[in-house]
Design a protein with these regions (language model features):
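Short, contiguous alpha-helical
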Residues: 2-5, 20-31, 40-86, 125-189
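Short, contiguous pre-domain boundary segments
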Residues: 3-15
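Active-site rim elements
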Residues: 13-20, 91-95, 140-144
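Juxtamembrane/interfacial segments around transmembrane helices
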Residues: 107-117, 186-189
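Acidic catalytic patch
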Residues: 111-129
Length: 189
């Protein structure tokens, strides 16, 4: 492996830090939606759905429970919070569970994106249904895009059911504010 110049090392460190900061804001987006969601939308029947489908409650439970699978399979040294029951969890329970699993996923990603030779997270195992990948930026991209996809579903479902979210504030698009809420001293870069 070729030695990296200081400039290359600094550039890679900046990219790593940006990915970690973005993931830190990921849960802030979920928390924002949970804080502004009308409680009547939590288990509301889905519009036009005849064969099941996930309620907003079930989608938030799915997000949390996927995080637990990633943690158990990729970072077994990290403690997992309890799973959420998609049929019984409350909004308050989901918010608390997401804070805990989000913090553990950030710890997992911090190790996975580390250049340290003794890192504990060397693989990303999503479950028995999928191939295992090397831990790294692709792991981050999968985790973030999975959650962004389901956030979009949640916002669309709420809107379709008449429970508009984030219509008076930039919400999930106001990343500078999310950065501050996540306690980050930097700004998106």
């Amino acid at each position: 492996m070729a030695l990296q110049s200081r400039g290359e090392h600094a550039a890679l460190a900046e990219i790593r830090d940006s990915l970690l900061e973005t993931y830190a804001c990921n849960d802030a987006m979920n928390q924002l939606i949970l804080s502004e969601l009308d409680p009547r939308a939590w288990r509301a029947p889905l519009p036009g759905e005849k064969r099941g489908g996930r309620t907003i409650a079930a989608i938030f439970a799915h997000l949390h429970n996927c995080r637990l699978s990633w943690l158990k399979n990729s970072a077994p040294h990290l403690k997992c919070p309890a799973a959420l029951d998609p049929d019984r969890c409350t909004m308050k329970q989901a918010a608390a569970a997401h804070r805990k699993s989000g913090a553990q996923c950030l710890r997992m990603l911090t190790d996975a994106l580390s250049a340290a030779p003794n890192r504990l997270v060397a693989k990303f195992a999503r479950g028995s249904w999928a191939q295992t990948w090397p831990a790294g930026a692709t792991m981050f991209a999968y985790m973030f895009s999975h959650e962004a996809h389901h956030r979009g579903q949640i916002l669309l479902l709420a809107h379709q059911m008449g429970y508009r979210l984030l219509h008076t504030t930039p919400g999930v698009w106001h990343w500078e504010k999310l950065w501050k809420q996540a306690g980050l001293a930097t700004r998106p870069h």
